[in-house]
Amino acid sequence: MASINRPIVFFTVCLFLLCDGSLAQQLLGQSTSQWQSSRRGSPRGCRFDRLQAFEPIRSVRSQAGTTEFFDVSNELFQCTGVSVVRRVIEPRGLLLPHYTNGASLVYIIQGRGITGPTFPGCPETYQQQFQQSGQAQLTESQSQSHKFKDEHQKIHRFRQGDVIALPAGVAHWCYNDGEVPVVAIYVTDINNGANQLDPRQRDFLLAGNKRNPQAYRREVEEWSQNIFSGFSTELLSEAFGISNQVARQLQCQNDQRGEIVRVERGLSLLQPYASLQEQEQGQMQSREHYQEGGYQQSQYGSGCPNGLDETFCTMRVRQNIDNPNRADTYNPRAGRVTNLNSQNFPILNLVQMSAVKVNLYQNALLSPFWNINAHSIVYITQGRAQVQVVNNNGKTVFNGELRRGQLLIVPQHYVVVKKAQREGCAYIAFKTNPNSMVSHIAGKSSIFRALPTDVLANAYRISREEAQRLKHNRGDEFGAFTPLQYKSYQDVYNVAESS
């Protein structure tokens, strides 16, 4: 009997482990390889033979903010499969709950506030009971009838430099409780495998209405209404157990405040007292560095999530990319580079995107490189940079200056070089792969360092000495390069040879 059951037990255990691993990969959206992607390919006919710097071409005003739209009808946006929006939320402004058909990364350029992504099926872990004033003397039975309870899912406080990850179809809202406007750039990947609709961004409003940005050339103003507008008030009343009057309020038929509304008296939200105290004392940054930079790195640094480390409901949705202590590479004379990918920010497995923040000092140069497995959407946050991009035919497809507020799309495999101007430069690059990789041409861990000297000498018809210089002039630098002249390179090389 035991000999008969042993193979069955072994088969059952193997089947369970296989299914459990598959479930974990589905939950975390993890690709089987860094080289693979779940994105759809670009439409046929995409040539990428002329790149350009983009700025918002139109804006839509709401009661308490502005939504600025980039020209997503441009071929470059359509070929890379991304949509970009910049939002300005004024103090006490509330971005109404909505969800999108594509996964998004949000970078907070300025300001601070609160956001609340709502994940389906997750519990409302923030709970509190209130009692109306003047009820303390009532009996227990009477008191219960005068109590009401508020509960909601976890809310997240954000600040300047945070990257917020929003999976496709996850509703979220945002509130500015600071004293300056919140400025945020939203990059949505509509070619993501999670989007099974047509390849264009669709925002589904749960509240309010907004002006249609596509109608800016028309004489008649058009509005996009929220999802409840299409249902009858009778069905809404029955579904929610509310009156017809309240059901009509859900439809917001006469609400022209837009998607960002003003909360005159501010929001009353459940928040842990310690978080508020940390914010008031200005200690949030150091606390986050200890908790997220130390503990979280040791927990997830292996890059092998098993489905138990971080569940769907408790995933961190934000990470600060501006913190200098998080820099992956740093040159005190040139700048720093910080990467966010699924290894240190696991929710990016669901979003299938990643981000890189680059800070270049005065006249510093970023090593020429190409993106191996992703398109790159570069947004300048500070300063100016001279940028050149070259395609597979050796043709310069972009040669110009990028300044603050401008955006450049760099296609996969195209070679790019960036040089900061006198005031320096800072930018964030959104990548269409959760584990984006680049191949540097110069410096440490570069292509030239990996090639034999004789290969370089014969490939470029130069002497072996020149080939050695080509390999080692930037041999001690990685990523951000110090602005040196050729003579300085030669002096450094001669000193190294003599020693």
UniProtKB/Swiss-Prot annotation:
It comes from the Eukaryota. It holds the Pfam family Cupin_1. Gene3D superfamilies: Jelly Rolls. One of its GO terms (molecular function) is nutrient reservoir activity. Residues 280-300 are annotated as: Disordered. The keyword Zinc does not apply. Disulfide bonds join C46-C79, C122-C313. The keyword Disulfide bond applies. SMART domains: Cupin_1. PANTHER family: 12S SEED STORAGE PROTEIN CRB, OS03G0336100 PROTEIN-RELATED. Seed storage protein. This is Glutelin type-A 2. It comes from Oryza sativa subsp. japonica (Rice). The lineage of its organism: Eukaryota, Viridiplantae, Streptophyta, Embryophyta, Tracheophyta.
